[in-house]
Amino acid sequence: MVANSQHAGSVDMLSVNNLAPSGTIADSWAPKVLLITAYRWPTTSRLALALSEAGLTVEALCPVGHSLARVKFVSKTYRYGALSPLRSLRNAIAASNPDLIIPSDDTTAAQLHELYKLTDATDSVSNKLRSLIAHSLGDPTNYPIFYSRAGIASLAHAAGVLSPTTTNIHNHDELFSQLENIGFPAVLKSDGSFGGMGVAIIHTRAEAKPAFGKLTAYNKVARALSRLIVDRDANLFLPCLRRTRPQLSIQRFLFGKRANAAVACWKGAVLAQVCVEVIASNEATGPATVVTVIAHPGISQAVERLVRVLNLSGLCGFDFILDSTDGSAHLIDFNPRATQTCHLLSSERTQPVLSLAAKLRGLPPIVDDHLSPHCGPIVLFPHGPAYAPKSHYSKYTEIDLPSDSPELVKIALEYHRRKNRFLVKAFRFAKRNHTDRVE
């Protein structure tokens, strides 16, 4: 791999890799996808490998220091700037000229939607950019609702999908008024949040006011600095400088198991989906770390209805609660971007990434005969006993890690070493103590 800094016009290019990825589907023409991320999450590298193995040429827009810039299955990377994200997007798209754009986090998905909105259709270049975004993500008229939790819940109800009633609130009076109707426990959520952040479960009236204050102060300087030091993440600084206050909503708490669906879709039709039940996660509302592949007709039907009414394309995900009384699936969140289980094989032996790649290639999706769905709990990358032998993951035997990818093994090891640094542990300990005092 040639790992040097080059400049192509106004684009900051992080690396160029001329080595062909191993284990990919051979073809004389491989559609190109531009994978974009605002964060240094190792899961994005796992997604890149799956896209490459499905027969796609993968380029990436990512922050400096991301593992995407040094793996052989990503052919080229461009520098993402947290303080000028739209310029980063526009320049990388122009330089890459991809067949499809795949956002891997809510931040870049929202920025793509904003770029579409702010780009005037006045010339051929602008028209091409807008067409590519719409081609990659689906009907642009629905973009504004993607980040409104109350809006998505209302749309779900209209489509006949079970979902807790979600109401926007703006002050303490509205908060306590809604609590009188909903009862306890209740869930407060902020629009635009993801990964379990911006969510608070409140059990008593005494917890309500501090939780409301914490979520409305989501973009304070202290939080931005904490994210920069702990996670090397500068993405909160721009909202902090803009003094952005998120819209809050409230819904009743649903008792049951968490589940989600990773989906590939095209112009409002589902190509493939994989449904999983969450066995373990980072904190109560955080991303799943251990899942089990399941077949759930209620989830599958809900996904088909939502994809159709939103007229979606590309990769996306839906989060559900499986009711503890009857197992029915209730929608609690929508993720307008690729999610971390989209490379898994479903109970029907379909795979979202493979199906999307086949659609781009104009071929039917073909799953290798020797592959079969996991029968038990799967520890998702980058977690697992090989990297954290003393953790609770040691009791699981199924690990989401290709045996022929030493690059991903190295990335996972680096992730756990970084997570266990003394300074990071100290900040997280202080953060937990502060949260306990606030809530």
Q: What is each PLM-predicted segment?
A:
Residues 35-46:
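A short, glycine/small-residue-rich beta-strand->loop->alpha-helix junction that serves as a flexible
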Residues 60-72:
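Short, glycine/polar-rich helix-capping loops at beta-to-alpha or helix-loop-helix junctions
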Residues 70-170, 176-177, 194:
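Conserved N-proximal alpha/beta basic substrate-recognition cap immediately N-terminal to
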Residues 164-166, 186-231, 258-260, 280-292:
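Glycine-rich phosphate-binding loop of ATP-grasp-fold ATP-dependent ligases
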Residues 213, 219-281, 294-299, 322, ...:
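Phosphate-binding site of ATP-dependent enzymes
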Residues 244-247, 284-326:
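A long amphipathic alpha-helix within ATP-dependent nucleotide-binding catalytic cores
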Residues 337-353:
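ATP-dependent carboxylate-activation loops
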Residues 354-439:
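Peripheral (often C-terminal) accessory segments that flank ATP-dependent C-N-forming ligase machineries
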